[in-house]
């Protein structure tokens, strides 16, 4: 347990229990793990911050219906994709800089299909994210869900999705929960690697994000996935 905590201090007792069961062959009751953690002074380093919704575009060119309708599951990979953009900050001396992360999440295996980082939150950011996803999955024609951010409501973006054989879906006004799973991913990433830390360069912040997404896809166990990683579930589904 000490080794797990030293390697990943963000893990709470539930995730420590999952690690013990999966990788050490030691199935232990969660309450017992909690008691031992308390006796050893093991506590998750996760920090929390307030959450908010993306503001809707002021002059949208295209507003599709909420086709997804909170049906946050899929029978196979590349059936339903969610996307969103989130903001990070880093500091160079007393100057605050912003960095934006755009990502696409698959609802079957919860893997991050693609992501992009830019200094500006613009249409180029979401186009790059989509282009990467299409390049990696050329035969994918998923339902594509987002909030009403200005980048997703342009006619150009809608036409891009249509050309790729995708159906566009969009959250209702002010309903963050309509895009809940990817909002949840932002929370996981920031709690485990961002909150409580001060990044002093763009390179340092970008490196953290890239490394975390690789860790999330290939190494981070999820109970909703049967204590498997997203890429393990993806491989299992494709082999079925």
Ranges and model annotations:
Residues 70-113:
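An active-site-proximal beta-strand-loop segment
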Residues 162-166, 188-240:
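C-terminal domain-tail junction helix/linker
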Residues 1-76, 175, 229-238:
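Basic, flexible linker segments flanking DNA-binding modules
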Residues 97, 115-137:
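Active-site beta-loop-alpha junctions of metal-dependent nucleic acid enzymes
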Residues 54-59, 146-148, 154-157, 168-190, ...:
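RNase H-like two-metal-ion nuclease catalytic core shared by retroviral integrases
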Residues 1, 16, 33, 37, ...:
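Mobile genetic element proteins and their domesticated derivatives, centered on retroelements
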Residues 109-115, 168-171, 195-196:
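Short small-residue beta-strand/loop micro-motif enriched in glycine and branched aliphatics
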Residues 9-13, 29, 60, 64, ...:
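Hydrophobic (often cysteine-bearing) scaffold residues that line and stabilize catalytic clefts
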